[in-house]
Regions:
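N-terminal amphipathic/basic leader segments beginning at the initiator methionine
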Residues: 1-62
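Glycine-rich phosphate/pyrophosphate-binding loop regions near the starts of catalytic domains
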Residues: 50-107, 133, 138, 211-234
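Short, histidine-centered active-site or binding-site loop motifs used for metal coordination
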Residues: 90-92, 141, 206, 267
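Glycine-rich phosphate/diphosphate-binding loops and the adjacent beta-loop-alpha structural elements
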Residues: 91, 228, 259-269
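Short glycine/threonine-rich loop-to-helix capping motif typified by GTGT followed
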Residues: 99-101, 144-152, 265-269
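Glycine-rich, mobile lid/loop segments that gate access to catalytic sites or pores
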Residues: 106, 111-122, 126-246
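Glycine- and Gly-Pro-enriched alpha-helical subdomains that act as flexible
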Residues: 245-252, 265-269
């Protein structure tokens, strides 16, 4: 789908231009895809995949709500040391959907497992099977509606076909736009620094507009680095910084079932 900011950005921010945003480019080991799965019944990307062909170390923090969405339950059940894929859908929060919502995620993960394993065979010298328990989910949107499992499953082959191994600013922008719900504009940022004499990249995208209280409500944030950092270090870094960043935001006094901030390390530097 062509990248048209007007399909995503609200009227209050229609004067936004690509030049207003930082120039995120390539992070080795991370691949991106975004498609329209027709979750909104209009032409906009609403399903986004991040694919780590060699796996990525990771850490996450989640909502402090006692009631959580089905994707948070799924993510909390994952015990894999490395993650192969993160899939984010908009329009539907998969909250208050019960066993059917969780079952839907399992079906999607199994389909992604099959399709990405095929891609490994096609693209890699030493292919490895991608397992369903190496996949994380982010869901955001309306609470209490039936989860659109079949719509999402139907678009998994297209999502994988459109994976871009080399990223650039438009691809990162598609991902940032693709996870938006009521946001006025996309949220993406980058920083580069040195660890010793080695330059590393830290990129991130996020969404969140209303219901931001307390501690991240209705916020999704995804951070990516090519630095070689262990799960333990990533977890410590995330927990150390979350209180002065995502947990410091308040918007309208409501909380959410779906908060999620994750950091992924491809370990390529």
């Amino acid at each position: 789908m062509p990248l048209n900011l007007k399909n995503f950005i609200k009227n209050q921010a229609l004067n936004s231009k690509m030049s207003d945003f930082q120039d995120l480019d390539h992070i080795d080991g991370a691949s991106i895809s975004a498609v329209c799965a027709n979750l909104y019944n209009k032409p906009r990307d609403d399903l986004v995949m991040f694919y780590f062909r060699d796996g990525a170390n990771y850490a996450s923090v989640y909502t402090q709500s006692k009631i959580v969405s089905e994707n948070i339950k799924w993510n909390l059940s994952i015990k894999s040391k490395k993650i192969k894929s993160l899939i984010v859908n908009t329009r539907n929060a998969n909250a208050f959907t019960g066993p059917d919502g969780y079952k839907g995620l399992k079906e999607i993960a199994q389909e992604v497992s099959i399709q990405l394993s095929k891609k490994q065979v096609e693209d890699e010298d030493y292919p490895k099977r991608v397992l369903a328990n190496e996949i994380l989910f982010g869901c955001t949107g309306t609470i209490g509606e039936k989860y659109p499992t079949e719509k999402i499953k139907k678009h998994i082959p297209e999502l994988i076909k459109k994976i871009k191994y080399v990223q650039n600013k438009p691809i990162w922008m598609k991902a940032a736009l693709g996870i938006m719900t009521t946001d006025l504009k996309p949220k993406l940022a980058m920083e580069e620094c040195k660890i010793g004499n080695t330059k590393v990249k830290i990129y991130g995208i996020a969404k969140g507009s209303g219901m931001i209280f307390p501690n991240m409500a209705t916020t999704l944030g995804y951070i990516f680095t090519d630095a070689d950092l262990s799960n333990d270090i990533l977890s410590k870094l995330l927990k150390k910084n979350i209180d002065t960043t995502f947990n410091a935001i308040t918007c309208d006094g409501d909380t959410s079932t779906n908060d999620m901030v994750s950091i992924f390390s491809t370990g390529k530097v």
